[in-house]
Amino acid sequence: MLALIGLKDANMIAPHYSLKFPLVNHLPNHELIRMAQSALISRGNLTSKDLIKIGDLLWANDQSSIENMISSIPGDEVVDNALSLNAESRKKFGHYLGGVFVYEGECYWGIDRLPLLEKRLKKLGLKTNDGPNVVQRKHNDIKDIKNLDLEIDVLWSARSPYSYLAMKLLSELSKKYGVKLNYKIILPMVMRGMKVSLEKRTYITKDCKRIADQNDIPFGNIIDPLGYAVERCYSLYA
């Protein structure tokens, strides 16, 4: 289910950043992924063009074209060692997933966090021209707002800092567009038996802090409400 949601999410987000993502309903198979990994490793000093080209071929399910890019197929041990070393580097950087950009100790996961990186680079005076930002999300400001009788189901967790951050923005959205919010409380991940790594907890906290600062939302001095506090909070909705 998570993989399918990720595919749909990528497809919906891409146009807002003037990008394209193929209409696919399944992930590339293991053999194709392995071939793409071999192609990347065999090229040595990778460039962004290499990554884009191999990525396009991967999602197009074009195994033969990927194979043609490999002059000498690396052995399984070489590929496994490279993946292991990179996984260790990712852990040292303080993250736990792919699609992560790291600059001076700060992680940026996914395209929607790249504007934060660009903002940081601009503050350092590294922008070389007066052109528009590289990473811009398209949006339309609707002036004539009509009450369309829409509803949004909000899956809300008392322990999730993202749920906390969303409350202010969702409230503003509801007032501006006449949207009804249906809050549906869910148990925190840990209380559902899921394991949350130190890297994940740390990244989420740091990420929420910068998003909170960006939207003028107080965030800090955290006391974990896990357990009894969450249960007491949810009892209000019983």
Describe every region a protein language model picked out.
Residues 150-152, 160-161, 180, 188:
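Extended cationic-aromatic binding surfaces that line active-site or macromolecule-binding grooves
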Residues 45, 51-143, 151-153, 159, ...:
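C-terminal cap of thioredoxin/glutaredoxin-like
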Residues 157-161, 227:
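Short, surface-exposed acidic/glycine-rich loop or hinge patches that mediate macromolecular interfaces
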Residues 1-58, 166-238:
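Structural alpha/beta surface segment adjacent to cysteine/selenocysteine redox centers
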